[in-house]
Amino acid sequence: MAANGSQRPIIAFMSDLGTTDDSVAQCKGLMHSICPGVTVVDVCHSMTPWDVEEGARYIVDLPRFFPEGTVFATTTYPATGTTTRSVAVRIRQAAKGGARGQWAGSGDGFERADGSYIYIAPNNGLLTTVLEEHGYIEAYEVTSTKVIPANPEPTFYSREMVAIPSAHLAAGFPLAEVGRRLDDSEIVRFHRPAVEISGEALSGVVTAIDHPFGNIWTNIHRTDLEKAGIGQGKHLKIILDDVLPFEAPLTPTFADAGAIGNIAFYLNSRGYLSLARNAASLAYPYNLKAGLKVRVEAR
């Protein structure tokens, strides 16, 4: 029986391996060999190599879109070949949905049962946002030679310590038998900057540049704006890195900004405050990067 309780096991695969050689194909070939009939969905293989925080952003919302029991094989492994092992966790999708309840109860066909999913990843912080947004039921260090090679290739732990065991788990191998159970303190996490709210002003950071469009994503969520009394139509001043100000109303779409090139403030598909130019790049002309400070003021 597959991990999702059906005859069609699913692995969603994210990595930094790229698609210019056969690395991803090797991983997927092993997945199909170990778990015949598996459906392997490519999430992304072009993330910035070794960027754990970027990878974490790509995997946190996945349970909203996949059937219960899906195995998420997620990897960027800068410490390949070292004592850094993989961790396998069972998470339960939040009752209000994987992205703070955006679609909960909407009846639009996207809401899933409050069921469990398995993530497997290097224990290097990649699961930070997953664990914070969803919580988890149980976590294990992946060490059993029933699911990983006895002598793993030291330069390719993404294959040996993530792809291979993900296939065994998708095929129904018991999660509790992949290795010893981990205490919460043993799961590596990175620091996530907090959003500060003072009246109708908020402070946060740029979390990502939305390639290839050049839009700017922040860590300020819809719920943070609501706490500050800010909603659609509110005119805002947003200052980046203390020196670069932009002004516009918060609107649902880019087109609401008007002419091409006009500034648009909007909530991205993940529910976070973002900045853009209508049909043009905002980030690239200024060479803006993740990590910049963001200040939002209602006007």
Curated annotation (Swiss-Prot):
Changing residue 279 to Y: Increases the conversion of 5'-CIDA into 5'-FDA. It catalyses: fluoride + S-adenosyl-L-methionine = 5'-deoxy-5'-fluoroadenosine + L-methionine; (R)-S-adenosyl-L-methionine + H2O = adenosine + L-methionine + H(+); chloride + S-adenosyl-L-methionine = 5'-chloro-5'-deoxyadenosine + L-methionine. Keywords: Hydrolase, S-adenosyl-L-methionine, Transferase. Homohexamer; dimers of trimer. NCBIfam families: fluorinase. GO terms for molecular function: adenosyl-fluoride synthase activity; hydrolase activity. Its EC number is 2.5.1.63, 3.13.2.3, 2.5.1.94. The keyword Nucleotide-binding does not apply. InterPro entries: Fluorinase, SAM_HAT_C, SAM_HAT_N, SAM_OH_AdoTrfase, SAM_OH_AdoTrfase_C_sf, SAM_OH_AdoTrfase_N_sf. Belongs to the SAM hydrolase / SAM-dependent halogenase family. Adenosine binds at residues 16, 77, 155, 157-158. The gene is flA1. Catalyzes the formation of a C-F bond by combining S-adenosyl-L-methionine (SAM) and fluoride to generate 5'-fluoro-5'-deoxyadenosine (5'-FDA) and L-methionine. Can also catalyze the hydrolysis of SAM into adenosine and L-methionine, and halogenation of SAM with chloride to generate 5'-chloro-5'-deoxyadenosine (5'-CIDA) and L-methionine. In vitro, in the presence of L-methionine, can catalyze the two-step conversion of the non-native substrate 5'-CIDA into 5'-FDA, via the intermediate SAM. S-adenosyl-L-methionine binds at residues 16, 21-23, 77, 158, 210, 215, 269-270, 277-279. It comes from the Bacteria. This is Fluorinase. The keyword Zinc-finger does not apply. Pfam families: SAM_HAT_C (PF20257), SAM_HAT_N (PF01887).
